[in-house]
Amino acid sequence: MFLNSLDLPGQPENSRIVVAMSGGVDSSVVAGLLKKEGYDVIGITLQLYDHGAATHRVGACCAGQDIEDARCVAETLGIPHYVLDYEERFREAVIDPFAASYAHGETPVPCIACNQTVKFADLLATARELDADALATGHYIRSRSHGAHRALFRPLDSDRDQSYFLFATTQEQIDYLRFPLGDLPKARVREMATEMGFVVANKHDSQDICFVPQGKYSDIITKLRPEAVNPGVIVHVDGQVLGKHSGIVHYTVGQRRGIGVATGEALYVVYLDVENARVIVGPREMLETHKLFLRDVNWLGDERLDNFPPDGIEMAVKVRSTRPPHLARLHYQEGVFSVDFLECENSVAPGQACVFYDGNSDGARVLGGGFVTHSERAAETEMMLKRVLCNLETTSAVASEFKTKVSYT
């Protein structure tokens, strides 16, 4: 059977492809490439939010000027283009959970939630309703045939690798999705945009958290979850109250800058005691993480979960999109996934994603991932954290005395 460039049967003109057009360079080039090859291309842009200043902010996406840019590109290509209002859905599926997660002391990754719900569930369903054979996006990731299905692989351009944000894609979605930029470097994509005459050829790349004006995520969280800005105290792991804070929303595990205390010692946020509004700080070595426990795991590997090896599977994992994969061993016992690092990781916060790969090479296959619920650190660190957390009554008394001496700003 003849397969076209998207691994679909038949000639390109016999395949209808919906392209998710954000108004940026990447998705515009995808639409241009597919149109040039002869596919029946339909562009769809999702209006996800309209938050005043964010609408025209450099680096924003899916609002205001971006919609106009997508429309202009579609006109240049001569393809149909539709704008769908998904603001309410985006708020419910992405923004509200993002704020709730931060209020619980987690470090969420909203782009993953957006891909899970709005883009690869709702938009994909719309593409099927339009009788499209595939949904194509401008993500930098590769997909190709793997047995009876398709699998995800890290892209050619490792600097643009977006596999971390796509681990939650289900097998059914992977089979329907196409990623034409997976084998192209970003520099070449920009050249193509210029060659195609797109007005977006020199447009800035969108930021990770697209709905946050000027990167001030605390403003949105303060509005949606005011309890996250309750004042509290900053406590050293030795139990000493060092200072005050104006809300745990301003802190994340591993943070060093902007903690708000000066002791002459290099201090990092090592734990957030959300219930008691306490920020626990300590030396960097207390951030060394040996084991993770995960929730909401999407497993894309070949091994059946009911036949998972008792001693686990060695693989590479990423706990941040900007970090390289590190070797670890994945375990699955009694419905619980856990990860043992072969070399300790640093600054792993609840809510972060942990993504699995079959190796640490540039073209490694994505095996899924999950979200961190909690971690285990060195035995001494665990003991010190338990001690300061159990010493709540004493710490609270000291904190009350401290508050009488210092006024909150």
Swiss-Prot record:
ATP binds at A20, M21, S22, G23, G24, V25, D26, S27, L46, G138. Disulfide bonds join C114-C210. It comes from the Bacteria. Its main location: cytoplasm. Coiled coil: none annotated. The record marks H139, Q352 as: Interaction with tRNA. NCBIfam families: PRK00143.1, trmU. Catalyzes the 2-thiolation of uridine at the wobble position (U34) of tRNA, leading to the formation of s(2)U34. This is tRNA-specific 2-thiouridylase MnmA. It comes from Bartonella henselae (strain ATCC 49882 / DSM 28221 / CCUG 30454 / Houston 1). The lineage of its organism: Bacteria, Pseudomonadati, Pseudomonadota, Alphaproteobacteria, Hyphomicrobiales.
